[in-house]
């Protein structure tokens, strides 16, 4: 694009840094190649000399004579409705967004993150719907294949949903059946031990008894 933002009388400029940073002014006169006489009657900037390196030229131009007084500048400013036009530009919106982002807290950033995730999820689902609709419209063969795939996916999802319920009932029955042997085992432990078990447990005690009987004989 051709550059059209020239330094001229009536050009509205944005002050990028300095004591009046963030405000708009109108160039009333050009002093030299480095400075200009500016005035901002509607932005509370007094008429003063300002270097060009502090200003960024905008697309707005006011119509008033060379070195006009403040009342003429104010009248032209209000007639052109510069403040509302400036607020509607991308430039002003980006500056406002940057300032709001700098003032955000951790909780605000967390809410923005969750909102972005939700937005991306909604966009993804809508894109998938549009893709499926496009496939169905493209060719009948692909439409049939797509319908079969959708049906298979639905059946698989239904099967997965039913399998855990069956598994849950199966182990429950087995567990109920296993409770009876556990009770029997407890009953066996409570009963007194048999004599044969005593002899098996203490073979060393009965071994010296026969030796003693042989000596007595």
From Swiss-Prot:
<dbReference type="GO" id="GO:0005737">
    <property type="term" value="C:cytoplasm"/>
</dbReference>
<dbReference type="GO" id="GO:0002181">
    <property type="term" value="P:cytoplasmic translation"/>
</dbReference>
<feature type="repeat" description="1-4">
    <location>
        <begin position="188"/>
        <end position="192"/>
    </location>
</feature>
<feature type="region of interest" description="Disordered">
    <location>
        <begin position="162"/>
        <end position="217"/>
    </location>
</feature>
<dbReference type="InterPro" id="IPR002784">
    <property type="entry name" value="Ribosomal_eL14_dom"/>
</dbReference>
<dbReference type="GO" id="GO:0005829">
    <property type="term" value="C:cytosol"/>
</dbReference>
<keyword id="KW-0832">Ubl conjugation</keyword>
<comment type="subunit">
    <text>Component of the large ribosomal subunit.</text>
</comment>
<dbReference type="GO" id="GO:0005840">
    <property type="term" value="C:ribosome"/>
</dbReference>
<dbReference type="InterPro" id="IPR008991">
    <property type="entry name" value="Translation_prot_SH3-like_sf"/>
</dbReference>
<feature type="modified residue" description="N6-acetyllysine; alternate">
    <location>
        <position position="85"/>
    </location>
</feature>
<feature type="modified residue" description="N6-acetyllysine">
    <location>
        <position position="79"/>
    </location>
</feature>
<feature type="region of interest" description="4 X 5 AA tandem repeats of Q-K-A-[APS]-X">
    <location>
        <begin position="173"/>
        <end position="192"/>
    </location>
</feature>
<comment type="similarity">
    <text>Belongs to the eukaryotic ribosomal protein eL14 family.</text>
</comment>
<feature type="repeat" description="1-3">
    <location>
        <begin position="183"/>
        <end position="187"/>
    </location>
</feature>
<dbReference type="GO" id="GO:0098794">
    <property type="term" value="C:postsynapse"/>
</dbReference>
<protein>
    <recommendedName>
        <fullName>Large ribosomal subunit protein eL14</fullName>
    </recommendedName>
</protein>
<feature type="modified residue" description="Phosphoserine">
    <location>
        <position position="139"/>
    </location>
</feature>
<feature type="cross-link" description="Glycyl lysine isopeptide (Lys-Gly) (interchain with G-Cter in SUMO2)">
    <location>
        <position position="124"/>
    </location>
</feature>
<keyword id="KW-0963">Cytoplasm</keyword>
<dbReference type="InterPro" id="IPR039660">
    <property type="entry name" value="Ribosomal_eL14"/>
</dbReference>
<feature type="region of interest" description="2 X 3 AA tandem repeats of K-G-Q">
    <location>
        <begin position="195"/>
        <end position="200"/>
    </location>
</feature>
<dbReference type="GO" id="GO:0140236">
    <property type="term" value="P:translation at presynapse"/>
</dbReference>
<keyword id="KW-1017">Isopeptide bond</keyword>
<dbReference type="GO" id="GO:0003723">
    <property type="term" value="F:RNA binding"/>
</dbReference>
<keyword id="KW-0677">Repeat</keyword>
<feature type="repeat" description="2-1">
    <location>
        <begin position="195"/>
        <end position="197"/>
    </location>
</feature>
<comment type="function">
    <text>Component of the large ribosomal subunit. The ribosome is a large ribonucleoprotein complex responsible for the synthesis of proteins in the cell.</text>
</comment>
<feature type="repeat" description="2-2">
    <location>
        <begin position="198"/>
        <end position="200"/>
    </location>
</feature>
<feature type="repeat" description="1-2">
    <location>
        <begin position="178"/>
        <end position="182"/>
    </location>
</feature>
<dbReference type="GO" id="GO:0003735">
    <property type="term" value="F:structural constituent of ribosome"/>
</dbReference>
<dbReference type="GO" id="GO:0140242">
    <property type="term" value="P:translation at postsynapse"/>
</dbReference>
<dbReference type="Pfam" id="PF01929">
    <property type="entry name" value="Ribosomal_L14e"/>
</dbReference>
<keyword id="KW-0007">Acetylation</keyword>
<feature type="modified residue" description="N6-succinyllysine; alternate">
    <location>
        <position position="85"/>
    </location>
</feature>
<feature type="repeat" description="1-1; approximate">
    <location>
        <begin position="173"/>
        <end position="177"/>
    </location>
</feature>
<keyword id="KW-0689">Ribosomal protein</keyword>
<dbReference type="InterPro" id="IPR014722">
    <property type="entry name" value="Rib_uL2_dom2"/>
</dbReference>
<dbReference type="GO" id="GO:0022625">
    <property type="term" value="C:cytosolic large ribosomal subunit"/>
</dbReference>
<feature type="modified residue" description="N6-succinyllysine">
    <location>
        <position position="206"/>
    </location>
</feature>
<dbReference type="GO" id="GO:0045202">
    <property type="term" value="C:synapse"/>
</dbReference>
<dbReference type="GO" id="GO:0098793">
    <property type="term" value="C:presynapse"/>
</dbReference>
